Structures are given as structure tokens and as C-alpha cells.
Swiss-Prot record:
It comes from Trypanosoma brucei brucei. Pfam families: Trypan_PARP (PF05887). Residues 60-118 have a biased composition (Acidic residues). Sequence repeats lie at residues 59-60, 61-62, 63-64, 65-66, 67-68, 69-70, 71-72, 73-74, 75-76, 77-78, 79-80, 81-82, 83-84, 85-86, 87-88, 89-90, 91-92, 93-94, 95-96, 97-98, 99-100, 101-102, 103-104, 105-106, 107-108, 109-110, 111-112, 113-114, 115-116, 117-118, 119-120. Residues 28-125 are annotated as: Disordered. A lipid is attached at residue 121 (GPI-anchor amidated glycine). The keyword Repeat applies. Keywords: Cell membrane, Glycoprotein, GPI-anchor, Lipoprotein, Membrane, Repeat, Signal. It is a lipid-anchor; GPI-anchor. This is Procyclic form-specific polypeptide B1-alpha.
């Protein structure tokens, strides 16, 4: 059985590799992306920095809206006179059956859009999985 210090060293290496991998992925995004921005993803535009006093477009002290004035009740209308009964209509002639319409041709399926290329410096599967693989190898080697 290996000494306890080797187990602790393996756990330390595992943790260090994970934190380093996350740090490298965050650093790859670039210094201009640090901090919160409002506006979300746009068409290549950067969002504006969120300040401490920013209320996300809402007024912190809204003015109360004036209450609407009650409308006067309308006067009741006189009841209309009953209409005389209409005469029964003659039975309509049966319509000839329409010819069935030919089925429309199915539209060709649009070509699937190609996957967009990742932004330069964005975290990829390789940049995230590499620290996990190194840390796992260190754990296996220690035990």
C-alpha cells in the first residue's frame, strides 16, 4: 500500500490540473470579455459594460399613474319589436362533387446549415478535456 502522502499528492495534482484548465479556458476568451455585459449576443457587436447604478432600463422610482375617471353608465336602450317569422326556404339542389385536387409536389428539403466555426480562443472540447485527462492519468499513476 502506498504511503498517505502519495495519495494526497495525487489529489493535489488532480485539483491543480482542473483549476489550471478552467483558468486557461477563461483566459482564452480575452481580457475585453471580463465582467458582465448587457445586450446579449448580437451580430458581432460587443455589449455595454454594466455599471453599479444600471437598472437594466427600468426606472427605479416610477411615477404613479393617474387613476382613470369612472365612465358614466349608458342609458338603457328600448327593447326592439319582435321580427315576423321568415318563410321557409326551398331545399337547395345537391352540388356536384368536386374533382379531387392533385397532391402538390413535396418541396425539396433545404440543405442543413454548416456548423459555425468557433470564435478564436473559445474553449473547445480539447481545451476542456485535456486537464481532465492529465489529472486522471496522475491519479492512475499514483494508485
Amino acid at each position: 500500500m502506498a504511503p498517505r502522502s502519495l495519495y494526497l499528492l495525487a489529489v493535489l495534482l488532480f485539483s491543480a490540473n482542473l483549476f489550471a484548465g478552467v483558468g486557461f479556458a477563461a483566459a482564452a476568451e480575452g481580457p475585453e470579455d471580463k465582467g458582465l455585459t448587457k445586450g446579449g449576443k448580437g451580430k458581432g457587436e460587443k455589449g455595454t459594460k454594466v455599471g453599479a447604478d444600471d437598472t437594466n432600463g427600468t426606472d427605479p422610482d416610477p411615477e404613479p399613474e393617474p387613476e382613470p375617471e369612472p365612465e358614466p353608465e349608458p342609458e338603457p336602450e328600448p327593447e326592439p319589436e319582435p321580427e315576423p317569422e321568415p318563410e321557409p326556404e326551398p331545399e337547395p339542389e345537391p352540388e356536384p362533387e368536386p374533382e379531387p385536387e392533385p397532391e402538390p409536389e413535396p418541396e425539396p428539403e433545404p440543405e442543413p446549415e454548416p456548423e459555425p466555426e468557433p470564435e478564436p480562443g473559445a474553449a473547445t472540447l480539447k481545451s476542456v478535456a485535456l486537464p481532465f485527462a492529465i489529472a486522471a492519468a496522475a491519479l492512475v499513476a499514483a494508485f
